[in-house]
UniProtKB/Swiss-Prot annotation:
Major place of residence: cytoplasm
Catalysis performed (reactions): 3-deoxy-alpha-D-manno-oct-2-ulosonate + CTP = CMP-3-deoxy-beta-D-manno-octulosonate + diphosphate
Pfam families, sorted: CTP_transf_3
Native species: Bordetella pertussis (strain Tohama I / ATCC BAA-589 / NCTC 13251)
Domain of life according to the entry: Bacteria
Cited InterPro entries: Cytidylyl_trans (IPR003329), KdsB (IPR004528), Nucleotide-diphossugar_trans (IPR029044)
Lineage of producing organism: Bacteria, Pseudomonadati, Pseudomonadota, Betaproteobacteria, Burkholderiales
Pathway(s) this gene product operates in, as recorded in its UniProt entry: Nucleotide-sugar biosynthesis; CMP-3-deoxy-D-manno-octulosonate biosynthesis; CMP-3-deoxy-D-manno-octulosonate from 3-deoxy-D-manno-octulosonate and CTP: step 1/1; Bacterial outer membrane biogenesis; lipopolysaccharide biosynthesis
SUPFAM superfamilies referenced in this protein's UniProt entry, alphabetically: Nucleotide-diphospho-sugar transferases
EC number assigned by the record: 2.7.7.38
GO cellular component, one term: cytosol
Gene3D superfamilies membership: Spore Coat Polysaccharide Biosynthesis Protein SpsA, Chain A (3.90.550.10)
Protein's recorded name: 3-deoxy-manno-octulosonate cytidylyltransferase
């Protein structure tokens, strides 16, 4: 199985300024992400950034980075530019690892890539784990996904899906026993041909209402398959508290 890992790293962040360059045990966060990705089975790991400072920081630690335009509306648009710059063939597979995931498990990267390889009818693969509790089911910041028996995504939503009619009757807020409720994890594998088409796809109503970019692909008829894992991976870094948690994890490892 051959695949490339691309790590989109946008320097601007409203909650955590200069997030890709935040120090984690002596190295920038984006470098820590690249180190984790390099432990996977990827043939190549490349950072795609909009700022020369990130490119320089990556190079200083021996990691390759490509400079992309600063005006991309999404990280997927940034990947589209990157695959063209790298000259990747249409049938190649790219795994998108977010630049704020310094604790990502290399085995998860491999598993999502393998899920796409095993599904020639699909353009995208992603990942999900069982919902932990009722709080997660009703939390709009926890994205849910429902799938077919062969792990094809039917829908992604911030709403509590599937809706357990009897268990939730009368306004109850519980996680019904046995409910096939899955928490979406934001790691993706793409076929390069899809990434090249993505910038031309128009936003649909579902994406606009849910604010979930993956719905754009589904609204245009693209198939997404979902790797199921038993437990949730470590959360990404979005806040100063998240950053301190990641720093502590690395300190404990060293």
């Amino acid at each position: 199985m051959s695949f490339t890992v691309l790590i989109p790293a946008r320097l601007a962040s409203t909650r955590l300024p200069d997030k890709p360059l935040a120090d984690i045990a002596g190295k920038p966060m984006v470098v820590r992400v690249a180190e984790r990705a390099a432990l996977s089975g990827a043939e190549r790991v490349m950072i795609a950034t909009d700022d020369a400072r990130v490119q320089q920081a990556a190079a200083a630690h021996g990691h390759a980075a490509i400079l992309t335009r600063p005006d991309h509306p999404t990280g997927t648009d940034r990947l589209s530019e990157a695959v063209d710059a790298l000259g990747l063939p249409d049938d190649a597979i790219v795994v998108n690892v977010q630049g704020d995931e310094p604790l990502i498990e290399p085995a998860l990267i491999d598993a999502v890539a393998a899920q796409l390889v095993a599904a020639p009818h699909a353009d995208i693969a992603t990942c999900a784990c069982p919902l932990a509790d009722a709080e997660a089911l009703f939390n709009p910041n926890v994205v849910k996904v429902v799938c077919t028996a062969d792990r094809r995504a039917l829908y992604f939503s911030r709403a509590p899906i599937p809706w357990a009619r009897d268990a939730l009757a009368g306004g109850a807020r519980v996680l019904a026993p046995g409910l096939p409720a899955w928490h979406h994890i934001g790691i993706y594998a793409y076929r390069v041909a899809f990434l090249r088409r993505f910038p031309a796809l128009s936003q649909g109503q579902l994406e606009r209402y849910e604010s979930l970019e993956q719905l754009r692909a589904m609204e245009h008829g693209h198939v997404i398959v979902v790797h199921h894992t038993d437990s949730a991976p470590a959360a990404g870094v979005d806040t100063p508290a998240d950053l301190e948690r990641a720093r502590a994890a690395y300190t404990n490892r060293l």
